Regions:
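Well-ordered, non-membrane alpha-helical segments in soluble/globular domains
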Residues: 102-117, 246-257, 316-324
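Acidic-basic catalytic patches of nuclease active cores, encompassing PD-(D/E)XK
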Residues: 19-76, 120-126, 133-209, 330-335
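Active-site or metal-binding loop neighborhoods of secreted/extracellular toxin and effector enzymes
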Residues: 143-169, 286-335
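Acidic, metal/cofactor-coordinating or nucleic-acid-engaging core segments within structured domains
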Residues: 109-112, 185-206, 234-282
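N-terminal amphipathic/basic-hydrophobic helices that include classical n-h-c signal peptides
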Residues: 1-21
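Conserved catalytic cores of phosphodiester-cleaving nucleases, focusing on short active-site segments
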Residues: 52-58, 62-108, 113, 211-215, ...
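Nucleic-acid nuclease catalytic cores
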Residues: 116-146, 255-294
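Structural alpha-beta junctions
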Residues: 62, 75-79, 109-129, 153-160, ...
Length: 335
């Protein structure tokens, strides 16, 4: 049955049901050469992003942040900029978004999340910036524009400062934060979270990598970095281990995360843990996930312990809570 959207709105208005229209949407992982081809996921259990959502984490006085961050590779140190990206829907202009900036940011992220981000930035001496862009644009054209919205946080209140950048200016900003040009080769990424990221992966202004999840405690202190490692093959999850990927082919990725761990630890004078969580996308192999504890300095990392658990039997909150409990137990044993 097809119902016109304006008729649907009239029905909702008559029933006093409010429709919240969002200008922003999250980026998503898909093939760079075909954005309709999404990355594989486990259809029975879902993904760690769902298992460890803030709706569930908050019930155990824990909070998670996901963001992109920079390493200045000229000095092997963290550049204090946190980027959080969002796509602006094509029906809205940048100026329309700026005109409703406060309300749209609050609708997308929530006031509590924004306050936590602000406190985190203050505690760890970092600048939070939101990268907002029209992803349908031709990102090979250096004249195309995007928006950077900087978050300020003073005396418990946040505010936003937007600034438009041309793609050429954005590339220079990436190089500045990265300690110079940075690339992965002319072929670029196979999978990316946006057309923008995919396009930049073929240049010497590579979009920064991410922290899949940084866990904060009830005092907003960083506790643990979690890297999610998707297993798409048919081999047992028990065969997934750190030495499969470190020091090659993913040494730089893990070095980045270890440098972030060390930066945060130095700012808070506390120990921060580093885990890799392996999970399968295939449903015909044994349904388990694996957690490895990673230790050592950023230039010489190693796995010191590992644990294997049953995957969530379904996509229910009760099953996901079991994952949170297992991770919390491993953290508690090492705190």
């Amino acid at each position: 049955v097809y119902i016109r959207f304006d008729y649907l709105c009239l029905i909702f208005e008559t029933l006093n049901i409010k429709i919240t229209t969002l200008m922003l949407q999250k980026t998503f992982l898909a093939r760079c050469d075909n954005r309709a081809c999404l990355a594989k996921t486990n259809i029975m259990s879902g993904s760690p992003e769902a298992w460890l959502s803030n709706d569930l984490l908050s019930k155990s006085n824990t909070f998670g942040l996901t963001f992109d961050f920079f390493v200045d590779w000229a000095i092997n140190q963290i550049s204090p900029y946190v980027w959080i990206k969002r796509i602006l829907l094509p029906t809205y202009t940048y100026d329309e978004f700026i005109g409703k900036l406060d309300s749209e940011m609050e609708k997308e992220f929530g006031k509590d999340y924004l306050c936590r981000l602000g406190r985190f930035a203050t505690e760890y001496d970092m600048q939070i910036q939101f990268i907002v862009f029209h992803d349908e644009l031709d990102w090979s054209n250096d004249r195309n524009e995007l928006l950077i919205v900087s978050l300020s946080f003073k005396e418990g209140c946040y505010s936003f400062s937007p600034q438009k950048y041309s793609l050429s200016g954005f590339k220079e900003l990436i190089k500045s934060h990265s300690g110079g040009p940075v690339s992965i080769g002319s072929k670029g990424l196979i999978y990316g979270t946006s057309r923008l990221e995919c396009s930049l992966s073929k240049t010497d202004s590579l979009y920064p990598g991410d922290a899949d999840l940084l866990l904060l405690n009830e005092d907003n202190k960083a506790v643990c970095i979690l890297e999610f490692k998707k297993h798409t093959l048919s081999s047992p999850i028990s065969e997934q281990c750190f030495t499969n990927y470190y020091p090659r082919p993913d040494g730089r990725k893990y070095k980045r995360l270890a440098l972030l761990r060390d930066y945060l630890a130095s700012k808070s004078n506390s120990r921060i843990l580093f885990f890799v969580l392996y999970y399968p996308t295939q449903t015909y192999i044994e349904q388990q996930w694996k957690l490895e504890v990673i230790e050592g300095n950023a230039f010489s990392l190693r796995a010191t312990d590992s644990f294997i658990f049953e995957l969530p039997a379904d996509k229910s909150d009760n099953e996901y809570k079991k994952v949170i409990e297992k991770i919390s137990q491993v953290i508690a044993a090492r705190s």
